[in-house]
Every structure is written in structure tokens, then in C-alpha cells.
Regions:
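Nucleotide-state sensing region of NTPase/ATPase domains
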Residues: 1-46, 50-52, 58-64, 68, ...
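Alpha-helix initiation and N-capping motif
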Residues: 26, 50, 54, 79, ...
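Noncatalytic linker/hinge segments flanking ATPase motor cores
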Residues: 32-36, 48, 76-86, 184-186
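Low-complexity, flexible helical/coil segments
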Residues: 44, 72-76, 176-181
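Residue-level detector of solvent-exposed, low-hydrophobicity positions
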Residues: 45, 52-53, 63-64, 75, ...
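Long, non-coiled-coil amphipathic alpha-helical linker/lever segments
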Residues: 57, 64-114
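Conserved NTPase motor "head" modules and their coupling/switch loops across ABC/AAA+ ATPases, GTPases
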Residues: 91-188
Length: 188
């Protein structure tokens, strides 16, 4: 089936069209055409903050999966709600725990997807890198999260959150989680 997609970017915002009809939500574009564009500005990915690296991987995954988009959105809402609960003068620990239990569920999904995506991307990059470089360097990247990535991720998360809970109450915010993850790039 032939699709016609158009994106017009002006100095104020993006305008999205599908078959000449305006599209209100970016998520309506997801999964129609899979493409990753790389330009010189993207080199900042290696030198900028972890937030920008997370944003890069999230944007690419959102292009590939509406499920990822909704899961990430759920996490962001839960994180905001948990942080609001931690900011109360009289913290409702039961409510904070309810948010945490839900956060653990969605984080396990996001961690797996981010890690799988990065591994897949790096496999392709290792395959193509020799065509762009005369050097015999080996490149790599690792997804750095706050827990080991294994079948027991959820129990590791629970333990990690239990260890920092008193500190979170003092700082009135969630101190660990996927919102603090990073990508470690390696050369040789």
C-alpha cells in the first residue's frame, strides 16, 4: 500500500500530514515508515548529556512501536505522580509504593526494549563501520541502567528502590530509574 507522509517544519512547530490530511498526533506516524536519519548534529550524541542519549534511543523506539510510546508515557506519568507524592509534607508511603509497583512493571519492559534496540543498532554499526573507517578499531555501546539486565530485573529494582527510599523522602524525588539511564560508547 502506498503511503504519502509529509512533515513541514517552520520556526515555530512541525506540521504533519498523511494523504494531505493534517495529523494531530506524532504517534499516528509511528510504524508507517521505518527510517533513521543521521546528520552531523547527531555527533553531539557522543558528547552531550545522558538525557540527550536517552531521548535519541526513545525517539527511535517510538518510531518503531506505538506500544513503546504508550509504555514510556505511562512511566513518565507514574514518575511525575510518585515525585508529587514524595513532595508532600506527610508522605503517604502506601501511595508511593503503589506508584513504584507500577513503575517497576513498565521499567522492565522499557529496559528490555532499549537494551535490545541498542544491541541491534550496534550489531549493524559494527558491520558497517569498516566501510567508513580505514582504522581497525572496534566500536561498541552498552546500555547503562541502575540494575542488572537479567530475568530477575523486577526483584533487583525493588531492592534498589528499597535501599534509596529514605534518601528519596529527604530529597522529595525519585533518585533512580530509567529516567537516569545512559549509553556508554566504546572504541577499542
Amino acid at each position: 500500500r502506498k503511503e504519502e507522509l509529509k512533515v513541514i517544519v517552520d520556526h515555530q512547530k512541525k506540521h504533519l500530514f498523511r494523504f494531505q490530511n493534517p495529523v494531530k498526533k506524532y504517534s499516528d506516524f509511528i510504524g508507517i515508515e521505518n527510517a533513521i536519519l543521521f546528520c552531523p548534529d547527531d555527533l553531539s550524541l557522543f558528547t552531550s548529556s545522558p538525557k540527550n542519549r536517552r531521548r535519541f534511543i526513545d525517539m527511535e523506539l517510538m518510531k518503531l512501536s506505538k506500544t513503546y510510546t504508550s509504555t514510556l508515557s505511562s512511566y513518565q506519568k507514574l514518575l511525575k505522580q510518585r515525585n508529587q507524592a514524595l513532595k508532600q509534607s506527610n508522605i503517604d508511603e502506601c501511595l508511593v509504593q503503589i506508584y513504584l509497583d507500577q513503575m517497576i512493571e513498565v521499567q522492565s519492559v522499557i529496559i528490555k526494549q532499549r537494551n535490545e534496540f541498542l544491541n541491534s543498532l550496534m550489531n549493524k554499526a559494527r558491520e558497517l563501520y569498516p566501510f567508513f573507517s580505514n582504522e581497525k578499531e572496534e566500536i561498541g555501546a552498552k546500555y547503562m541502567t541502575f540494575i542488572p539486565i537479567d530475568p530477575d530485573m523486577k526483584s533487583h529494582m525493588k531492592e534498589a528502590y528499597d535501599k534509596v527510599f529514605e534518601k528519596e523522602k529527604r530529597y522529595h524525588q525519585t533518585l533512580i530509574g530509567i529516567h537516569r539511564d545512559d549509553i556508554l560508547f566504546e572504541l577499542n
